[in-house]
Amino acid sequence: MKNKNISFMTQAAMIAAIYVVLTYVFAPFSFGEVQVRISEALTILPVFTPAAIPGLFIGCLIGNILGGAILPDIIFGSIATLIGAFFTWKLREKSPYLAPVPPIIANILIVPFVLRYGYGVALPIPFMMCTVGIGEIISCAVLGMVLYFALKNTQRHYLHSKISITDNFIVNIYFKDNFYQSPELI
């Protein structure tokens, strides 16, 4: 049980860190009324692990803070990502093509109101729903599905793998058909 908790927290932390880095690196595209937040492609990850739900939420929270977002954006933008991640996880048994839908809808319904009432953007809310929606479709549906199929193909190779570390810090990796042993580190 303890190893499962550690694994869960490690996965969540790694996902949060990747989300923050992608948001920060692509900051010019990640904020505003017309945005394509590349890190939102990670909202496909709850299909693979429930640890992605808190990971994406914390990553979005930290990414918004580091990106200089205002408090309503930090709170409600992160909640939109949390809602999207949760419902992506709930849809994990359905078609993979449905997985990007929850974060797209959550952001379309929440972010335009943050832009209007938090940032004072004078554009009509339906227009901002369209611009945010287009950005989310690019991030979640297009890039997210690319990530999904890349991970799905990789998962096949590592599904039957085992990793062990010996006393001499030699890493042994047992794949389904192959064996790899790293050189001795110490």
Task: Show the residue positions of the predicted features.
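Intrinsic-disorder-associated, low-complexity terminal segments enriched in Asp/Asn/His/Tyr and depleted
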Residues: 167-168, 172-180
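Membrane-embedded alpha-helical hairpins and interfacial helices in multi-pass inner-membrane proteins
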Residues: 28-33, 41, 61-76, 80-86, ...
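Short, intrinsically disordered C-terminal tails of secreted or membrane-associated proteins
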Residues: 181-185
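Membrane-embedded alpha-helical segments in integral membrane proteins
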Residues: 18-24, 56-64, 112
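Hydrophobic transmembrane alpha-helices
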Residues: 1-47, 51-54
